[in-house]
């Protein structure tokens, strides 16, 4: 466990799950932001693996060992046993390593890293990497012969694991697949699965605040991909909007959806809105033909380029706008808060309090209680 001031501690648990007072094991070899410890007992030693140096370019893996669980721990003379020392290499920010031994007796280090594109941006956030561990004559583990992370490596001689493809979701089940995430817990009635649709309740708060809820996201896993969703034509009051979002956090995101204009008789517009720190950029929109039952929203991604298109039949797509450099969706995009999760993409609905403040020419009031209905979401790399 990482203590309050970056001090690695181990909590000793009794069988009745009562926690004793913490005991300091080791301050870390680098003495800066030691975290994520893993203990391994091997050949009479307790090996303490740590991530150190923070989540930026100085991220690294170190190891120390002791004959006794509570120390004293001796730092490895080869530390850091994993770090990227070349800023020009594609794989950076290596840390949080865990040693594993295969059934064949081979040792590997599973660790986190970031792959950069463009001018050093890692839009996929922290990814999982694998490199071999070898043990020195004096009993120390070193990773990839201390050469740093490998961009190309021989995979372990193990049975292949076939994972179920959940790239497309027609929302036919009574539950969401594990691909879907919420940045914050939605309202109790915020997400509903009914009649092969996912219904997202319009949030009172917009995406630019941590109070925003009912945002349904999945991780961006590829540098190049296309995402399409089928949205039932919404009935919106002025100021309300719903659709797709390319989302990092409340500071940086893109909205691509149907917006109701702030008019007594609102028009529906298809808009692309960028949020970059304190700046909001609204691009020229397209009038929506709401005589259609559905509208298809499509986002094509090529590294840091995004192209936004729409269709009424899922065949003939019309481009709304292309953005050439969405750097702000990357971990390094802006300096505001902790950023290491990578970009996400998904769906949202925003109600605000526009509906309840709206009155038409006949004195009828609007409502903030609406749901955006999505028939499917498809992700293809």
What are these regions (language model features)?
Residues 1-381:
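Carbohydrate-active catalytic/glycan-binding domains of CAZyme proteins
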